[in-house]
Amino acid sequence: MFKERPDGYGLRLGDWRTGLLWTLAGCAGMGLILWFAARHPTMASFYEQRAPDGAGRIILLNAIEMWGWEFMWRGLLLFGLARALGPGPAIWLQAVPFAFMHLGKPQVETFTTIFGGAAFGYIAWQTGSFVYPFLIHWFILSFTMLLATGRIG
């Protein structure tokens, strides 16, 4: 890994047109769902307790956290596993530990992450980049926190 180029692990723009379409569709679709889901008492309570002070800090700190998450799951794990096993198994295998990392979060979120992780894996594989899952995931987390804390909506 250390002698390989970072773009082999999705650290590149890849197919940016497809990535942009997935990002816009993913953010719009999840924005609509989260408009209601993030206000559920369980979600609101969970994220309100964990949100940093101020909208700017929420957005910045979530960007840093999600960059690391997406590089780990969709960068290293997905592209690394795909070399050995092919893209189909790699997409599902990288989604499993991703889902386990959501244990302890609100139940509805935990149950949906296996499919969300697989969707992020598919987008990363299709575009050749983990940047687009990062943008969607960053939006999801930040939008959820901003809604849950009453900073928007």
Question: Locations of the language-model features?
Answer:
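Juxtamembrane helix-loop-helix connectors linking adjacent transmembrane helices
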Residues: 2-71, 83
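Membrane-interface helix caps and helix-loop-helix hairpins in membrane proteins
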Residues: 4, 100-108
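Short juxtamembrane and helix-loop transition motifs at transmembrane-helix boundaries
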Residues: 51-55, 68-78, 94-102
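Membrane-interfacial alpha-helical segments at the cytosolic side of multi-pass membrane proteins
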Residues: 74-85, 146-149
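Functionally important transmembrane alpha-helices
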Residues: 88, 92-95, 109-153
